[in-house]
């Protein structure tokens, strides 16, 4: 069982701890985090060097293009353009990530689509909401009345987040074609064929006046998939390259990797959960401090300790790591009970709080390297691992991960180093998935989820049945009509 991809809060993770200078991790200078290990290394991320990630003139432009190097610009003729909002809340339950984007092109069309991020915000959950969501992770406490009430309350919070980011982008709700809301996962049971995300889409549609697509995962489960991961579909659209094999590693509550082979088609892309991400790191910080810390911000606690090889050796024996792909995991496996066992064993070994934090941080990095050895290296020799999610702001974790992957000949970079956004990446993905849903285009990757066939994802709710659908707007555009706003 798994709690799928997480949209992590990163602001508090912009590290105060000092990383080992011997291990370089790429992060853009403007981000204020990791910088490259010399000019030769940095040259791989100069403007224009990531096809599809930068415009033809070298300036950062569209975040991705369906065809490598084919960034769509304002001057290249009339294209179908629209605005969408993506909402994401992940397994760390920190809050709501909201992204407003511009999408250009036709979903499923020969020309593909590209996406430009207009605005991003994170709206932290109120303390009582976060506390109750954690209680709902326990099936015995997730009674129908409690789940129903939180479903509506989250719908209101998501709607408010959507309206806020729309305003930040300089748009009005009337400009936006669709809101894509992942919702908050409270239970995910792929072996039983079901998943539960809450945050009512009908409430979002009613409060914003914008069509809303939500409940993305059940359609994949219904055709035999895991219902996760879903983000690899959008990663394929936005990141693939003709000559380099990329690994897109997200480190949210759970870690997950997408393998994008050089020159691949959608059938070649696969993805899976690598194991715990920030879940154990933050869990240890909270447990050993009696809740005084909600997370190990900046890896500060782990930086004061040393990883214990005895405990690491025991933790590496968990059966999940050897399970075949596709696979997914989550709090049901690496949650509170597992965490308490780790802390008890650590105390038996005489470990300090900092040593415990350092050990589970090293475990997360090891699990990513181990997954590469078991499930990727024999098929593809990766050139670059691009890391996103809240874990990318933990310098101790990134130091450990860079060391793991350097031993395997793989360079590690952050989303910011290649022109992306660690914070916004998954919210962007659900905006694009909603756009595909409105066009009734499949948006899962069977090779990633294990589904028997492609499926149209999500359920749509709308307050305005007269609002033009994507296909109708494209038909009008082809007949000479244009709703493209003047810039």
Name what the model sees in each region.
Residues 186, 382-404:
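Glycine-rich phosphate-binding loops at beta-strand->alpha-helix junctions
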Residues 140-199:
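Short beta-strand-loop/turn "lid" adjacent to the catalytic site in phosphate-handling enzymes
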Residues 93, 358, 362, 413-466, ...:
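Glycine-rich phosphate-binding/hydrolytic loop that grips phosphoryl groups
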Residues 157-165, 353-381:
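Phosphate/ATP-binding catalytic cores across multiple sugar-kinase/actin-like superfamilies
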Residues 102-165:
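Glycine-rich nucleotide/cofactor/substrate-binding loop typically near the N-terminus or early
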Residues 80-116, 247-262:
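Gly/Thr-rich phosphate-binding beta-strand-loop-beta motif of the actin/hexokinase/Hsp70
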Residues 95-125, 264-365, 369, 453-486:
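Conserved ATP-utilizing enzyme core subdomain
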Residues 81-83, 190-195, 202, 210-293, ...:
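Phosphate-binding/catalytic loop of phosphoryl-transfer enzymes
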């Amino acid at each position: 069982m798994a709690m799928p991809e997480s949209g992590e809060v990163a602001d508090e993770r912009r590290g105060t701890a000092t990383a080992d200078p011997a291990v370089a991790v790429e992060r853009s200078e403007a981000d204020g985090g990791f910088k490259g290990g010399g000019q030769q290394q940095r040259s791989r991320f100069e403007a224009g060097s990531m096809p599809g990630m930068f415009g033809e003139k070298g300036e950062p432009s569209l975040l991705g293009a369906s065809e490598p190097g084919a960034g769509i610009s304002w001057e290249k003729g009339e294209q179908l353009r629209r605005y969408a909002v993506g909402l994401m809340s992940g397994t760390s339950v920190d809050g709501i990530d909201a992204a407003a984007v511009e999408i250009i092109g036709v979903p499923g069309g020969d020309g593909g689509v590209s996406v430009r991020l207009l605005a991003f915000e994170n709206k932290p959950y109120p303390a009582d909401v976060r506390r109750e969501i954690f209680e709902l992770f326990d099936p015995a406490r997730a009674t129908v009345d409690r789940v129903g009430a939180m479903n509506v309350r989250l719908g209101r919070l998501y709607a408010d987040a959507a309206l806020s980011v729309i305003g930040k982008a300089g748009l009005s709700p009337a400009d936006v074609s669709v809101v894509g809301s992942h919702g908050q996962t409270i239970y995910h049971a792929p072996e039983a064929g079901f998943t539960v995300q809450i945050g009512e889409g009908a409430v979002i549609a009613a409060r914003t006046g914008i069509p809303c697509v939500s409940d993305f995962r059940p359609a994949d489960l219904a055709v035999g998939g895991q219902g996760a991961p879903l983000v690899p579909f959008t990663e394929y659209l936005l990141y693939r390259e003709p000559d380099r094999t990329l690994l897109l590693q997200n480190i949210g509550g759970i870690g997950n990797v997408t393998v994008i082979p050089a020159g691949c088609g959608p059938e070649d892309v696969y993805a899976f959960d690598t194991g715990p991400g920030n879940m154990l790191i933050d869990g240890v910080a909270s447990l050993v401090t009696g809740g005084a810390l909600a997370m190990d911000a900046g890896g500060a606690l782990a930086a004061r300790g040393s990883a214990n090889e005895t405990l690491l050796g025991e933790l590496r024996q968990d059966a999940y790591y050897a399970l075949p792909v596709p696979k997914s995991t989550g709090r049901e496996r690496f949650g509170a009970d597992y965490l308490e066992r780790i802390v008890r064993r650590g105390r038996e070994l005489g470990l300090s709080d900092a040593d415990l934090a350092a050990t589970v941080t090293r475990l997360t990095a090891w699990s990513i390297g181990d997954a590469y050895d078991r499930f990727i290296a024999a098929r593809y020799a990766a050139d670059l691992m691009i890391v996103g999610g809240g874990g990318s702001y933990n310098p101790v974790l990134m130091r450990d991960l860079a060391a793991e992957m350097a031993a395997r000949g793989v360079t590690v970079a952050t989303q910011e180093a290649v022109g992306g956004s660690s914070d916004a990446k998954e919210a962007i993905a659900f905006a694009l998935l909603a756009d595909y849903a409105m066009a009734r285009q499949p948006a899962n990757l069977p090779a990633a989820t294990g589904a028997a066939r492609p499926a149209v994802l999500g359920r749509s709710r709308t307050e305005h049945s007269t609002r033009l659908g994507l296909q109708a707007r494209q038909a009008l555009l082809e007949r000479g009509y244009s709703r493209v706003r003047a810039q």
